[in-house]
């Protein structure tokens, strides 16, 4: 299996912009998957994030980031994101979680991003929902703007199952 961002030559701003502009009827924005394991041990993550953000700016579309087990700091992502951009899998419990490891509170850069208008999405999926993160966020009133399943073949038999299951988890949090 090829890592998503293993080869830097696959990260191409111009091709992304051209593809998006040619398919505006079906493409709503740009998504970048930031995970060290899928980016040559993180070596290509910074370039991928920069190029994706620039492509979104160039095309005046939102950027969606998957930022889990990433070498990109929480200060940079969602710190560099714009109003209307989407930070998905916001309740994951992996490295680069939105919870500051020292204070065990929502990271100040995350709060600043929300104030700027960055949207936060559950994106439950296979392993992107962590009860401890959810409980901390609930205690602090940091609720997602979007509740989505991120349903795919790896999680329709659990843990996400379907939208009612994801919604029930959110209701359980408060």
Can you say where each PLM-predicted feature lies in the sequence?
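His/Asp/Glu-enriched, well-ordered alpha-helical/loop segment
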Residues: 130-174
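Acidic/histidine-rich helix-loop elements
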Residues: 3-5, 96-97, 158
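Histidine/acidic residue-rich metal-binding segments in metalloenzymes
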Residues: 11-120, 128-145
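Generic anion/oxyanion-binding catalytic loop in active/binding sites
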Residues: 5, 76, 169
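Active-site mouth loops of central-metabolism enzymes
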Residues: 2-14
